[in-house]
Swiss-Prot record, chains A, B, C, D:
Positions contributing to FMN binding: 125-127, 238-239, 278, 293-297, 319
Organism: Photobacterium profundum (strain SS9)
The protein's assembly and partners: Homotetramer.
Chain positions covered by the region annotation Disordered: 38-58
Cofactor: FMNH2
Name this protein carries in UniProt: Chorismate synthase
Described function: This reaction introduces a second double bond into the aromatic ring system.
A single GO cellular-component term on record: cytosol
NCBIfam families in the record: aroC, PRK05382.1
Class in the EC hierarchy, top level: lyase
Biased amino acid composition, Basic and acidic residues: 38-49
Domain of life of the organism encoding this protein: Bacteria
UniProt keyword Amino-acid biosynthesis present: yes
GO molecular function, one term: FMN binding
Length: 361, 361, 361, 361
């Protein structure tokens, strides 16, 4: 209830600050019998890891995850899985200059007022470094979903600043440092990032997350609709300011005759709904889009105040991404996977007895 | 966990189908000592109620709510509050024609596949009629927030189809049937609705919800951020396909130097963030936008299938809104109020000891 | 979280005061496809109902339960089930004499101090009248457990005051007003009750609850062990002051060589454990005992204080049971059934994939 | 929901197996501003630690806890606290002899059937080694309760086998290896343990846990009564088979005139209720008793079966306590402290507005 847990049956609880000793999480409720090693998580951790490309922060973290429990002889046992990543590059530098400073666009001011104290080193708990554990836990969900149910969860960068992709070639996504599915836009992204670096500024981004081969029936009426829970889990990612399911905000100008996805015996004719009807998966691809704000960690000077009630100017030096949206791709995948996994377990908990002869389309 | 509950400390659990005997809800965790009568809820219920204007469905429901428990001598007692609304206009008409039909854009197919059985009368549990109880519960939250903490939660229609409002005059909202804050757009909305009625079609809408006078500090890191929980509660409203906090999807093209809300001793200079930083309320107005899809209950014929695996044509006759977004205004207010109320109680549960001398801006 | 809900996947939330308009509950998470009518609940409600025998309170309540939602054409639909029982015999008598009085052994003082206000009529929310809804919800669980899984949950009175039963004849339990499985003790119980009535006093009781045909595997390590959750649900019944699983407090003087239930290929040789090992059901009968205190609603004068800070004498007149333990028999069954049902759904949520070739004994 | 979490606002989630790499836990919801170091936990960990006395198992574990997050400059920050204890004495011995063996009285059979796989080394997750993290988390709760609210939680051994204590001298408890408050019984306990060691057998025990200076008002009607949640948390301790609140099972033979705790302006005259009325703390001492079964890890040969469906004989060699109840003293304190802490936060979450002029007695 204090917010560091997500999920009901597949539950992930995390801890750890940006410049603390370690990050960790506990996965509770993972089905037993799943083969699992650190390698299964390391791939996605590496995709999210800082310092892997010139486009992202140069902080060097190995992000090596260790499984501390819940796996025996290479298989999950059904008991709680403890995961740990040690922080190796905290750089115990002097933080006295930002100790009292409320950086605009950051959580400094709100954490300070909420708790009275805060770990000001690198944002403490509010740092996006926390998302490493989401990616680790998400990798477990992704493996289970893929291996046992054939469900695949993938994401890509669909827009950065004014540059939008024009096509989706799944093969391209891992071929460039932007998780960009349109090879023709890679240069434009590259150019934009260079420009921003030079100017010491940052830019927002749009990501698209897709889950394919999802069975019909996941999601609970009326508050825990699948789309509501997906909105929750995606909006919980640092910097996300908007979530769309399917056509999202485009529906405002659509007609009902245009939006409804007509059905034939061969399947749905369209997927404006993004794979969710009445809060329950329809069997079509789950499609979501998220908007990530430009980071406020920039060198353009800004006005702010201190915890002592003084005016101040802020410049955030250090190792920061001009576009935090890029590295959010594996995070978005992780969050969607965790939510689908949770709903899959919840669905069969209640409905394992159901037998229906109606054909699924 | 089965989805009919929202909130942790201020918990709302609902039941009821469109054409069942009654709708009801239990509010658990309401602070004691709040003066409360049915009238406090009836105003918002009437705002949501069908049949109150020519622009909305003509189903006639009194929507008279009864308090069954939890209130004694006009005051909440701190124990669970039972609320009931009897369905009076179910019109026990013949539903055999849609019994086997999966209406496109509706939850018919997904409920059927999930549960094996479904109450097909008027959508059963998936009907927006369910939202009446949200409004009733939300009215309790709104009263507490306003009376004890001075927090106000209001919403309005900001777009319908291609027609957007140009200004927000709070006084106007209750002066027209569209909850439109821009008097100059009322005629355009009216015209659009008439056109749609004639064509038997429907249209999407955009709503804006604003909470003012919210204290700094509400929201929990890292998964139960206030924005994540607001996204969840707003996305759980029928027909919502997108949620934005603050600038929402506009952030994609913003620069960090532009988006970050700089702070001065007189307060924040802007509110691009929508009143939430790091998942915690900043003391600025909470601002959210939602996109509602056009209803699929239209008379334009559409293609679909039946539970027996046959092709079929569907035309939805009956008493339906051409724009379901209009009546969603009080619902959106209710959901935001419930979420804020919950977080207010959660915040003080953990942090009641906190004393900070840092000035709030 | 505010306490009026029990269960995770099979969730029961209740409302209602002793002298309010109605009692109600919402069952969320019931599997779909279960045939269910009011009759299925009425039998247990009648067993718990006041006024049915000369041994229990003479308050006359029909306790007629109405299903308001979640059941369609005689079958559960998987959506939330709303239940309602109207209070018909509130007797709007004058309560001004106890309005300010804190009756010893009751919740008057604690509710008053916790909430600042309380519904003093008949104990309000703290009255055992609240348990009617537990019995109704428990009947749904009992039906599902029996019909789909063959699990049976039954209870009996095993001791009242110093009178203990010597044998358990399941056929006898419904043959007498005490739910006593030992026909030879019925007269002694009858005599004890008569004596207490004459003296205006009350007595404690011990109940035994047994679930048979429970599959191996229900219960979650480490905090939500089946025994821990059973202890929770049984201790939540009014007047319960102790819970034992299996041999309970007798284990203090047992040797390990005596207590451990040895296993053979024909099954366990004994059942000291009460059917739970390591918090997980073993496939043996689940056996629990509970101790219920003597009610404080007696006519023997007692010393107390008022909410105004004055000394006072209290005598509780009215329609009260000399032994509240008797009517608790169906309540205990209901609580055990609700807990087993919840764990059954939770177990299959996580472990539906498990295939083991090891024989179950 | 998968069982490795306890509490709602003060939440403790644990992981770790007996012979795994490490044990850990996450405390979520701890109020900020509490001074906290490893030392605050180490004292209780040492009290629970194996190998500290000749009466308990000789496994040597340093049980050194490390704080990984949530504490900054010696103070809790309000964010999740990560704790870790590395297993140092796993003794990677050969477990092939018990790999297929279901030890009677243990969780081997039930875990195997539930999950299909299990970590058989030393009981894996079902080992009481898991309780180290409960003690660590409990120490945080104990410190907060004591320092901020003056609440003290203490426990002692009240019976082992047939030997019962006759008096409670709080000063004595830490003066002997049995946590025995009656100096005159220490020799009898010592003799009993020696005898059992010689015979290779074990014995049960009874513990008493007391919380003093608890404010009136903690606990939630109707399912999350304080006594119900205490029963849950105490019954979740390994080997516990019974829980009593106040007079517990003695109430069966009590009269109402005897049991009800009469009230005067100077306070309650007695405390039969154990400090809880109607599920809510009364301001008196909270008193609970628990019964712990004799461990089945004994050298007396016993009959059992294997996972292959064969008969077998079992003798448990190794480093085991003849009376596991002794070391459960700090565990029982921890569990009661966690539950009180949770309810204290929950209470003020809902009821922080309450002002009552009625004097507390």
């Amino acid at each position: 209830m204090a917010g560091n847990t997500i999920g009901q049956l597949f539950r992930v609880t995390t801890f750890g600050e940006s410049h603390g000793i370690a990050l960790g999480c506990i996965i509770d409720g993972c089905p037993p019998g799943l083969s699992l090693t650190e390698k299964d998580m390391q791939h996605d951790l590496d995709r999210r890891r800082p310092g892997t490309s010139k486009y992202t922060t140069q902080r060097r973290e190995a992000d090596e995850v260790k499984i501390l429990s819940g796996v025996f002889e290479g298989q999950t046992t059904g008991t709680s899985i403890g995961l740990l990543i040690e922080n190796t590059d905290q750089r115990s530098k002097d933080y006295s200059n930002i100790q009292d400073l409320f950086r605009p666009g950051h959580a400094d001011y709100t954490y300070h007022q909420k708790y009275g104290v805060r770990d000001y080193r690198g944002g403490g708990r509010s740092s996006a470094r926390e998302t490493a554990m989401r990616v680790a836990a998400g990798a477990v969900a992704k493996k289970y979903l893929k291996q046992i149910h054939g469900i695949e969860v993938r994401a890509y960068l669909s827009q950065m600043g004014a540059v939008k992709i024009d096509k989706v070639d799944w093969e391209q996504i891992e071929q460039n440092a932007f998780f960009c599915p349109d090879a023709d836009k890679v240069d434009a992204f590259d150019e934009l990032i260079r420009k921003l670096k030079k100017e010491g500024d940052s830019i927002g981004a749009k990501l698209t997350v897709v889950a394919s081969n999802v069975p019909v029936g996941l999601g609970e009426p009326v508050f825990d609709r699948l789309d509501a829970d997906v909105a929750h889990s995606l909006m919980s990612i640092n910097a996300v300011k908007g979530v769309e399911i399917g056509d999202g905000f485009e529906v405002i100008e659509q007609r009902g005759s245009q939006h409804r996805d007509e059905m034939t015996l061969d399947g749905f004719k369209t997927n404006h709904a993004g794979g969710i009807l009445g809060g329950i998966s329809s069997g079509q691809n789950i499609v979501a889009h998220i908007a990530l704000k430009p980071t406020s960690s920039i060198t353009v000077p800004g006005e702010t105040i201190t915890s002592k009630g003084e005016s101040a100017e802020v410049i955030t030096k250090g190792r920061h991404d001009p576009c935090v949206g890029i590295r959010a791709v594996p995070i978005a995948e992780a969050m969607l996977a965790i939510t689908l996994m949770d709903h899959l377990l919840r669905h069969r908990g209640q409905n394992a007895d159901v037998v229906t002869t109606t054909p699924k389309i």
